[in-house]
């Protein structure tokens, strides 16, 4: 029976799944927008959102936990210096998943995963 077993297998071993979601989380935090399949996007929430919640409280222990889950010093710095402060007042729901059609090969449902309050296109330039 499958009672109380959460998460998707995605036709991968546990080590492959762990590595894939670690890499996807790093890409998401680096670019703030990624495109992936819908089941992977929904499962990525379970990895990425707790990292942002962890980054709201800056401590050495939390930084070490974040590094253990991302293996990237640059991303840990961005998490604690930028994203943790950006979402300090938000109680969760840091990611947005937008469906974007189907992949042209296997017709897999695709989705964009983005951080909610990301800067779109940069600063506005005033006309002179």
UniProtKB/Swiss-Prot annotation:
Keywords: Ribonucleoprotein, Ribosomal protein. Gene3D superfamilies: Ribosomal protein L17. InterPro entries: Ribosomal_bL17, Ribosomal_bL17_CS, Ribosomal_bL17_sf. It holds the Pfam family Ribosomal_L17. GO terms for molecular function: structural constituent of ribosome. GO terms for biological process: translation. One of its GO terms (cellular component) is cytosolic large ribosomal subunit. NCBIfam families: L17. Part of the 50S ribosomal subunit. Contacts protein L32. Belongs to the bacterial ribosomal protein bL17 family. This is Large ribosomal subunit protein bL17. It comes from Pseudomonas fluorescens (strain Pf0-1). The lineage of its organism: Bacteria, Pseudomonadati, Pseudomonadota, Gammaproteobacteria, Pseudomonadales. The gene is rplQ.
């Amino acid at each position: 029976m499958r009672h109380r077993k959460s998460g998707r297998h995605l036709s991968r071993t546990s080590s492959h799944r762990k590595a894939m979601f670690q890499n996807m989380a790093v890409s998401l935090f680096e670019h703030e927008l990624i495109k992936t399949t819908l089941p992977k996007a929904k499962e990525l929430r379970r990895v990425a959102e707790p990292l942002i919640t962890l980054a709201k409280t800056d401590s050495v222990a939390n930084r070490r936990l974040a590094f253990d889950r991302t293996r990237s010093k640059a991303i840990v710095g961005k998490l604690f210096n930028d994203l943790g402060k950006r979402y300090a007042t938000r109680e969760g729901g840091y990611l947005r998943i937008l469906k974007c059609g189907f992949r042209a090969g296997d017709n897999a449902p695709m989705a964009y995963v983005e951080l909610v309050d990301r800067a779109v296109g940069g600063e506005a330039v005033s006309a002179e």
